[in-house]
Amino acid sequence: MALRDNAIVGYAETKIVLRSEVDVWELGAEILDGILEQTGFEKGEIDGLILSSSSTGAGNIFWSQTTADQLALELDFCQTVDIGGSSPVGAVARAAAAIDAG
């Protein structure tokens, strides 16, 4: 399979609020619920997670693994992308490569 054979089938985002009272894990759950609703996938079908580091979890070198644990995801692949402003694009490229690798 070529990298161009992979597709983004859904996305979700949270409302951007300055100094939100919502916990970072609640935001993660909101994103997960939105993606599951949009795609029709079941939570158990998710086998990989790639996140960019956040200001909230920047000090946690296991940010993506901690997030997966908090969301009760059982994964085969989990990674944090921390390459500055290009982290979102880097995350998409790594996800495509991970899917391509099986």
What are these regions (language model features)?
Residues 1-80, 100-101:
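Conserved "HGTGT" condensation-loop signature of ketosynthase/thiolase-family condensing enzymes
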Residues 83-102:
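Active-site-proximal alpha-helical scaffold in enzymes
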